[in-house]
């Protein structure tokens, strides 16, 4: 799944905290950086005695999906919808509408535990921005 290693490290931004990112990026050699990256994912492997790391696979599958479905002005993983999808996975429900007199489109994504995200396309070109909640600052566990 990982084609560009440096990009794969940058894409950790939604699951790695600042200290973890600093630790990986402070490696002196590419081999050391690769080892630290692998250790990061080994700690999150739900079945460490198998060859497959389901957490790693799921995370980068979500990034691929985000790039294919939410890209536009930037890569899908960098968009607000991409970020929410990568962190929380597929929403239980997506409500789409145009309640505004100016024709702006909204999408409301609903997840379990009454968690909702509201996106509005202010430009009319599919560039949906997260408006509620305004900040997703926690490092969430994957919603599997």
Question: Which residues make up each language-model segment?
Answer:
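Residues within mature, well-folded domains
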Residues: 1-144
């Amino acid at each position: 799944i990982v084609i560009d290693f440096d990009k794969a490290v940058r894409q950790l931004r939604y699951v790695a905290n600042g200290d973890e990112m600093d630790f990986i990026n402070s490696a002196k050699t590419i081999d050391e950086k690769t080892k630290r990256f692998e250790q990061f994912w080994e700690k999150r492997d739900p079945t460490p005695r198998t060859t497959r790391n389901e957490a790693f696979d799921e995370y980068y599958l979500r990034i691929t999906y985000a790039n294919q479905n939410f890209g536009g002005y930037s890569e899908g993983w960098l968009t607000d919808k991409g970020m929410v999808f990568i962190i929380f996975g597929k929403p239980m429900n997506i409500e789409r509408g145009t309640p505004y007199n100016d024709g702006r489109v909204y999408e409301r994504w609903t997840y379990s535990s009454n968690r909702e995200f509201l996106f509005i396309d202010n430009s009319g070109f599919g560039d949906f921005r997260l408006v509620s909640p305004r900040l997703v600052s926690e490092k969430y566990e994957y919603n599997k």
